[in-house]
Amino acid sequence: MEMSLTDSDWDSSSDSGSSEHEEVEFSYGGRAQNIFSNLEETIGKIDEFLSFERGFMYGDIVRSATEPSGQSGRVINIDMFVNLESTHGKIMKEVDTKRLQKLRSISLSDYVINGPWVGRVDKIVERVSVTLDDGTNYEVLVDGQDKLVAIPPNLLEDSQYSYYPGQRVQVKLAHAPRSTTWLCGTWRGTQVMGTVCTVEAGLVYVDWVASIVMEGDRNLTAPQALQNPESLTLLPCVSHASWQLGDWCILPGSSHCDIAERQTPNVAAYNLNECHKTFQKGFNRNMQNSGLDELFVITKTKMKVAVMWQDGSCSLGVDSQQLLPVGAVNAHDFWPEQFVVEKETCNSKKWGVVKAVNAKEQTVKVQWTIQVEKEATGCVDEVMEEIVSAYELLEHPDFGFCFSDVVVKLLPEGKFDPNADTIVATEAKHLLTESDYSGAYFLSSIGVVTGFKNGSVKVKWANGSTSKVAPCEIWKMERSEYSNSSTVSSEGSVQDLSQKISQSDEASSNHQETGLVKLYSVGESCNENIPECSSFFLPKAAIGFITNLASSLFGYQGSTSVISSHSRCNDSEDQSDSEVLVQETAESYDNSETNSGEVDMTTTMVNIPIEGKGINKTLDSTLLENSRNQVRFRQFDMVNDCSDHHFLSSDKGLAQSQVTKSWVKKVQQEWSNLEANLPNTIYVRVCEERMDLLRAALVGAPGTPYHDGLFFFDIMLPPQYPHEPPMVHYHSGGMRLNPNLYESGRVCLSLLNTWSGSGTEVWNAGSSSILQLLLSFQALVLNEKPYFNEAGYDKQLGRAEGEKNSVSYNENAFLITCKSMISMLRKPPKHFEMLVKDHFTHRAQHVLAACKAYMEGVPVGSSANLQGNSTTNSTGFKIMLSKLYPKLLEAFSEIGVDCVQEIGPES
């Protein structure tokens, strides 16, 4: 309802507003206008502060914001500019961050060098220089004893900087302690107020990470954790690109004439000035002649970057707002100057550097370097260029350098051989123990990667020099290797060391070593062989068994079957959810069979008494003749020999003393459930001698990149089963074809408690079963779009970047499935030899037809539709498939498949 104001109402309102304005004017003593104008300006400043400015680091992978599904690139250079505001409200704009300095020369997490050792700064004890109000100057080592107490307001609410230049402090010292150095005047107890002039690192706690050690002295003792900063050398870093909003800094050489004064200072500056008035009288006369650099806070950032795109082109001065970060890097994406090797070969003398990448066609132009032995000249490097498929490349395992990596220069080969004759070894030892070797040599041998150029690595060394080296001349220090060095925290240790520092300007530290320079870690490396996320690495986490996600996933992909996590195997529930999925899976598979001459996949049931003694063990791996006079492999059976089972010798296996009646009964129930409800695409063998061991074979479902493949799993039931989930090992053959299935055989699934989960996602002793587990493998793990199984990747569903990566993942998954077929035919798992031969005898023609269809452009997983777009599949995929096709023909021919009429697809 609208309200209209009469003239009298308006006059009354105006009078009221006028009186209120006068009241405010009176209350604020004539400063109301100034405050209100400052308030408006402050709101504008807050909006500016909260404005989003996208930032990047060296080596980040990015895409163009205007073409998110296009090629990606790598950030190779950064220019950063910031707006600064001093504590007095004065501002500077568009300041290059290369001019900025931190409040201390050493900060937490910085890498430092002491002789051959590299460490990371873990804690800092500050040395503060204070000027008292009467002009007396002194330094104090602040070791947590409240020798200096900050007087409010404290401008820096940052735990990393307890003190900063210009800060007012109260000195709480009854006498001049050992850690105090008087620069001017003498100590008098009445001098308690002062101003901080400089703040530096007085003592540093270092966590020693690694060392360059000699071959004969692996027990080299690490330096003490508590160090004098003068004995340390700071490792170079690209700190100019790491500044953020709100960071405090110092601008060397800044003067009042360089600073633009605001016409009307903002509220924050006004308040700070009011607070500073309490100590300006004593501080100003010192500031005028002290030449102290003024303290600034960063209020705005702006970044320009240079990007090296996959096709080899370079864009300079790109505004960061025009780029998007690539959160999930495709495993088959490569970038110029990246070092690679061929997947299928183990030739350590052949490595390549990427020159250009066609992201759409998945092809890579590689410059190969091959070491060739020649009698006349010895070892010679031969260089050649080749365009290859991205699917046949891997990042070089030893040359995976990234920006800011800490690297060590290795001695030239043959410089020192511990097995050489005594004369040579003695000469080398004499060389390595010279005094300059323990000092300058290490500073010129430890550095940080700053770039890549023409197959070389650009390194900035600790001595300040920069050079380009071949990747084989340096070794990367893994930052995940941290030591458990003891941290000296006692007050006495700090005081003792500070006394030594005051007595001597330099700390002597001589380490004499002999032998070949190597990288040596103090601590133990991580047990999990999962590398840290960088610009070159694909993230290695795998998603768990997420039922709700699976439902939406299959709904999106057009699947007709949905698994229920509440599967029951009790006798009272004849029509369980598991049985429904079995029936649907079997129908889906049977409906996909188009060849009338193929095997009838109707399940043949074998009756097993509850005790498990009624199985005819003589029929192990026998073939049953069906109505078409064809033979097939039993779905479920018992075997005697399980000598090649992965868990046979496991220390977590079942001891005879641990066998209980309840456990045996539960296992027999599992056997009965498997016998009665296995779909015709799953085969299981249990071991008579070891009831806790099973082996299962799964057939890849139609419509997935795993179609027609065979996938084997070894299963062990722990003594606590079913209160603990079974242990599972996947027969990978050293290949990774799914985010949940690792090359090592590890299966990452929340249902197995090998991945995080909750509720129905995890193992339930009352409802979960082996059958449910196998169905989960087949329906949820080996699914239509396995790319989205990766943890967090479900957020990319429906997005251009995610769908593009999913297509690439499916192409590679099918290629690996074909490789696993070849491997399985030549070395099938025990007791499944006949299954492997029988399966591929009847499915070989279908596999070969699918390969031809994919070569013609049919999307992977939909080979039934022979009308495909020739541009659907990438050229890199077709290159690899054309190489695999003859190998498939050969492998199928070896088991008696007639492949004479099959003609390999054109490259």
Curated annotation (Swiss-Prot):
<dbReference type="InterPro" id="IPR016135">
    <property type="entry name" value="UBQ-conjugating_enzyme/RWD"/>
</dbReference>
<dbReference type="Pfam" id="PF23046">
    <property type="entry name" value="tSH3-B_UBE2O"/>
</dbReference>
<keyword id="KW-0547">Nucleotide-binding</keyword>
<comment type="similarity">
    <text>Belongs to the ubiquitin-conjugating enzyme family.</text>
</comment>
<keyword id="KW-0067">ATP-binding</keyword>
<dbReference type="Pfam" id="PF23043">
    <property type="entry name" value="SH3-B_UBE2O"/>
</dbReference>
<comment type="function">
    <text>E2 ubiquitin-protein ligase that mediates E1-dependent protein ubiquitination. Mediates PHO1 degradation through multivesicular body-mediated vacuolar proteolysis in response to inorganic phosphate (Pi) availability. Negatively regulates the protein abundance of PHF1 and PHT1s under Pi-sufficient conditions by facilitating the degradation of PHT1 proteins at the endomembrane. Functions cooperatively with NLA to regulate the abundance of the inorganic phosphate (Pi) transporters PHT1-1, PHT1-2 and PHT1-3 in different subcellular compartments.</text>
</comment>
<dbReference type="GO" id="GO:0016874">
    <property type="term" value="F:ligase activity"/>
</dbReference>
<dbReference type="GO" id="GO:2000185">
    <property type="term" value="P:regulation of phosphate transmembrane transport"/>
</dbReference>
<feature type="region of interest" description="Disordered">
    <location>
        <begin position="485"/>
        <end position="509"/>
    </location>
</feature>
<keyword id="KW-0833">Ubl conjugation pathway</keyword>
<dbReference type="GO" id="GO:0055062">
    <property type="term" value="P:phosphate ion homeostasis"/>
</dbReference>
<keyword id="KW-0256">Endoplasmic reticulum</keyword>
<dbReference type="Pfam" id="PF23044">
    <property type="entry name" value="SH3-C_UBE2O"/>
</dbReference>
<dbReference type="Pfam" id="PF00179">
    <property type="entry name" value="UQ_con"/>
</dbReference>
<dbReference type="GO" id="GO:0000139">
    <property type="term" value="C:Golgi membrane"/>
</dbReference>
<comment type="pathway">
    <text>Protein modification; protein ubiquitination.</text>
</comment>
<keyword id="KW-0436">Ligase</keyword>
<dbReference type="GO" id="GO:0005783">
    <property type="term" value="C:endoplasmic reticulum"/>
</dbReference>
<feature type="region of interest" description="Disordered">
    <location>
        <begin position="1"/>
        <end position="23"/>
    </location>
</feature>
<dbReference type="GO" id="GO:0005789">
    <property type="term" value="C:endoplasmic reticulum membrane"/>
</dbReference>
<keyword id="KW-0472">Membrane</keyword>
<feature type="active site" description="Glycyl thioester intermediate">
    <location>
        <position position="748"/>
    </location>
</feature>
<dbReference type="GO" id="GO:0005794">
    <property type="term" value="C:Golgi apparatus"/>
</dbReference>
<protein>
    <recommendedName>
        <fullName>Probable ubiquitin-conjugating enzyme E2 24</fullName>
        <ecNumber>2.3.2.23</ecNumber>
    </recommendedName>
</protein>
<dbReference type="GO" id="GO:0016036">
    <property type="term" value="P:cellular response to phosphate starvation"/>
</dbReference>
<dbReference type="GO" id="GO:0016567">
    <property type="term" value="P:protein ubiquitination"/>
</dbReference>
<dbReference type="GO" id="GO:0006817">
    <property type="term" value="P:phosphate ion transport"/>
</dbReference>
<feature type="compositionally biased region" description="Polar residues">
    <location>
        <begin position="495"/>
        <end position="509"/>
    </location>
</feature>
<keyword id="KW-0333">Golgi apparatus</keyword>
<keyword id="KW-0808">Transferase</keyword>
<feature type="domain" description="UBC core">
    <location>
        <begin position="662"/>
        <end position="822"/>
    </location>
</feature>
<dbReference type="GO" id="GO:0061631">
    <property type="term" value="F:ubiquitin conjugating enzyme activity"/>
</dbReference>
<dbReference type="InterPro" id="IPR000608">
    <property type="entry name" value="UBQ-conjugat_E2_core"/>
</dbReference>
<comment type="subunit">
    <text>Interacts with PHO1. Interacts with NLA.</text>
</comment>
<dbReference type="GO" id="GO:0005524">
    <property type="term" value="F:ATP binding"/>
</dbReference>
